[in-house]
Every structure is written in structure tokens, then in C-alpha cells.
Amino acid sequence: MATWLAIIFIVAALILGLIGGFLLARKYMMDYLKKNPPINEEMLRMMMMQMGQKPSQKKINQMMTMMNKNMDQNMKSAKK
């Protein structure tokens, strides 16, 4: 009977470890993306120039604000 108990504890520990690892990795990635967004102003400026638009600083600031706002909303909804 002791071997069954040991097997149950091992399986439970593995499941808890997987869940804990997933949650820690998810939190790390959320924090990393918040500190280092995947796109910055310079990349946005280059994209607009490639699309044939003349990027003004006001347009770039508006787009960055929209992207940051969208990212914040996504992070809040992911926490729920």
C-alpha cells in the first residue's frame, strides 16, 4: 500500500510543479513584455514610411498610446 501512496504523491507533485511553472513563466513573460514592448517608436516610424505614409510625431505618439492601452487591457483581462 505504501508504494501506491508514493506514486500518488509523485504524480501530485508533478502536476503541482507543472501548474506552478506555467504560472511563473506566464507572469515573467507578462512583465517582460510590459518592460520591453515588441514594437517601439522607431519601428513604427519605419513601418509607416514603408506603407507610404509620412509619419509625424503626433501620429506616432497616438499609435503608441493606442498600442499601450490595448496591451494594458489585454493584460487586465488575462489576469481575470
From Swiss-Prot:
GO annotations of cellular component type: plasma membrane
What stretches pass through the bilayer? 4-24
Q: Which UniProt keywords apply?
A: Cell membrane, Membrane, Transmembrane, Transmembrane helix
Q: Return the Gene3D superfamilies for the record.
A: EF-hand
The answer to keyword Cell membrane applying to this record is yes
Stated membrane topology is: Single-pass membrane protein
Can you say where in the cell this protein is located?
Cell membrane
- The disulfides recorded in the entry are none
Q: Does the keyword Transport apply?
A: no
Q: Which domain of life is it from?
A: Bacteria
What family does this chain come from, according to its entry?
A: Belongs to the UPF0154 family.
Protein name (record)? UPF0154 protein SaurJH1_1431
